[in-house]
């Protein structure tokens, strides 16, 4: 059964950035900077051409459009009307074919279970009251043999110092108040929720940042930001 797994304050907070979501030099420039790494990680674990993909918590559509450009039949879902409006407008300007819906992961999983080859949920789990519910919904959305991707922040001292103190207050890479440390998720927690739904871990990598060069990179260090890929076992027979 679908739940109202939503934090209205979070929706309003991110919706307030809708008008500059696609500005690569704006408040959310970090999303633009890390998106190529997200795509690199995704494409290392699955092909996208001709695949049916859903981007959960798509925001203004940065990753959703990248999935479509790589050949996926992409659907982006979010609960922010403002962000979906931004996503749809940018999609039209880009000449891409992307579908967007204002619906929760849980509700979509109730209506379209097992329909997607690829499920992505990036930088979203730490912004909902019940992240385990979203993980379960993403699992249900995936076809047998499909791949489910998450990215979030580790609940570690290093993440607090770098992602909050450093990124929000010292370097001002992202708006202050973007993150709540208590909502960060340890890799062991994410892996347990995924296992509970029957997913198998396929890979996990961190996202590192070099403050001297201003460049992001994939790394084996999952102490701060990390990406995880899980596979849903293929149907027997």
Curated annotation (Swiss-Prot):
Alphabetized InterPro entries for the sequence: Methyltransf_11 (IPR013216), SAM-dependent_MTases_sf (IPR029063), UbiG_MeTrfase (IPR010233)
Say if the entry is tagged with keyword Cell membrane: no
In short, the EC number is 2.1.1.222, 2.1.1.64
What keywords does the record list, in alphabetical order? Answer: Methyltransferase, S-adenosyl-L-methionine, Transferase, Ubiquinone biosynthesis
What is this enzyme's catalytic activity, as reactions?
a 3-demethylubiquinol + S-adenosyl-L-methionine = a ubiquinol + S-adenosyl-L-homocysteine + H(+); a 3-(all-trans-polyprenyl)benzene-1,2-diol + S-adenosyl-L-methionine = a 2-methoxy-6-(all-trans-polyprenyl)phenol + S-adenosyl-L-homocysteine + H(+)
Pathway(s) per entry: Cofactor biosynthesis; ubiquinone biosynthesis
Gene Ontology molecular function, alphabetical: 2-polyprenyl-6-hydroxyphenol methylase activity; 3-demethylubiquinol 3-O-methyltransferase activity; polyprenyldihydroxybenzoate methyltransferase activity
GO process annotations (BP): methylation
Annotated membrane-spanning segments are: none
Positions binding S-adenosyl-L-methionine in this chain are 38, 57, 78, 122
Q: What does this protein do?
A: O-methyltransferase that catalyzes the 2 O-methylation steps in the ubiquinone biosynthetic pathway.
User: What family does the database annotate?
Assistant: Belongs to the methyltransferase superfamily. UbiG/COQ3 family.
HAMAP family attached here?
Answer: UbiG (MF_00472)
Q: What is this protein called in UniProt? A: Ubiquinone biosynthesis O-methyltransferase
Which organism's genome codes for this protein? Methylococcus capsulatus (strain ATCC 33009 / NCIMB 11132 / Bath)
Mind giving the lineage of the organism this protein is from? Bacteria, Pseudomonadati, Pseudomonadota, Gammaproteobacteria, Methylococcales
